[in-house]
Amino acid sequence: MYEDGYENITNIDISHTCVKFMEERIKERCKNMKYKYGNVIDMAEYKSGEFNVVIDKGTLDSVLCGDNSEPNAEKMLSEIHRVLAPNGVFICVTYGDDESRKKYFVSFFFLTFF
């Protein structure tokens, strides 16, 4: 995305190791890209409406495989909804089938496309 002209990209990961590795890897060529440690279930450090676009690539799948999966998935999507700007876009890349995932989205997002 950065190489396509998108800037001010914030990447959030729950792994300190991943964040440190990626910060080192991108520091010279992607000056406006940030990697931050965080948990998508509680993104209190981010303001409501802070992001125009949120992309999830497999995080929902991981959350649904863990303990307290259903409540945590709802917390995650609630937080994404909160930090997403009005008319913002949420893109979720998931291996789950449409019907099993749809129930999580209808509570938080007006338009859902599968």
Model features per residue range: what roles?
Residues M1-M43, S78:
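Class I SAM-dependent methyltransferase SAM/SAH-binding core
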Residues L60-D61, Y95-S100:
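Short "lid" loop at the C-terminus of a central beta-strand within the Rossmann-like core
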Residues D98-F114:
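Class I S-adenosyl-L-methionine
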